């Protein structure tokens, strides 16, 4: 009988305190987003009319690997981040890889946590800016 843990659920104290920005760690950075009017690389300021300043700054950030999650957002995450992390032992075996592969089981959240994770943060920053 297989006794390995397959499902992992974070406690409230284990909820991340930072977002990970993969671009900061990429050796080859993605091509810049081009301004639709000028066709020149966009700056964070170009996004301010559309998004909250903090969201725009984070979107264009290529240097900080970790971005602090505001306490108020983390408190809201505690209500909604209950989706389990599942270890894909079968896939690891099929791929014959020593890597540990995990996936989030979003079937327990009707809207999918990625939507709430993003929406809560965007609403927080918009509220901060008035």
Describe these PLM feature segments.
Residues 1-130:
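PLP-dependent amino-acid enzyme catalytic core
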